[in-house]
């Protein structure tokens, strides 16, 4: 991961985020250019400037945590004590809990878009001012998407720390439980990301970019505003090309239900590991 041209949008991003880290809410000093960083969320374009809709403000500590996930494949196993491993797993579980909440909120917002935009169209037909409603909806969507994706990236980084633990210092039962916890947490991350991707399809079905929420032009596969490639909607269309929103919403709900089930399993397995660490 490199900073590339993220600097181009720093001022706008910091102003939008009230000069505070969107993960831990640490406030930066306006006079200190190193107090805050910009971090890209989602599948940003590989070349050119990253649009501010896909940039989140983070503090240096959170930026370093996020960097761990990208550096993890090259990292050496980390030796930790039973107490340190317990705290690490507990913190990872806490962070994932926050990610679940953020993803659920984003999914709820996304599934409300057809109704919201339909109401805007009705208001416009009646001669009422609808531009402010669209702007507010767009801002809420972008914020919700960034929050969900950032939370998932932070959870991924925490999970990489768990995976990087050198298990040879622990007995076989702890090693087995640790592996099971990491595997279950990874499954949870995949399910949550699936829910986000399916939620991102909703605005595309409404001819809006899933990143910046600006209108998509014609049959273009790439947004002319932020450069993101549009999500594929073919699987969510009926025989005559109409959008099958109910089926799409049902799939989003299925992903969230799956995440809930996996969370229950993860909680049980984490408690087992915690008990073993306490006894060791």
Task: Write out the residue ranges for each language-model feature.
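A broadly conserved sequence feature marking short terminus-proximal activation segments
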Residues: 1-3, 13-27, 149-203, 253-260
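Leucine-rich amphipathic alpha-helices with coiled-coil/heptad-repeat character
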Residues: 113, 117-120, 124, 192, ...
